[in-house]
Amino acid sequence: MPLPQPHDLTTLVLRTDFGDDAAWEALCAALDGADAYPCATPVSDPRFAGAGIQALLAEESAAGEDERICEVFLADATALAGPEHPLLAVDLFTEPGRTFRVPVRWYPEISANLSIANMDFAEYADAAGPSGTFRGFGDD
């Protein structure tokens, strides 16, 4: 079964940790408040509980060409536990399985640029710091 499709000009935020509903609600509220325009399609489906990167890649590779998405942002235990809600960005297309973390503060910029193909996943992943977290391009 393919991954859910994000709404137009947004990217998919997929919940994989179901241990704290309040943390999920806080993350969704942070995403809603991060930008004046919707930038996320949050999906909370228990079938993705504990889903790892390889399982998501397998699901996506089995999807039809017109059902595939290029990236997904995971709301995993780390994202739900941290005050910055660092989502795990996963490349599903160019370099399948490549990841970096992105705090909600930078999510709207990344989502917008990826959804219109203004920038690609690698540009953000390459700019991630030593911890693997993207915190802007240095002039932000």
Where do the PLM segments sit?
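Short linear, low-complexity motifs centered on an aromatic residue
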Residues: 132-140
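Short helix/strand-capping turn motifs
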Residues: 1-122
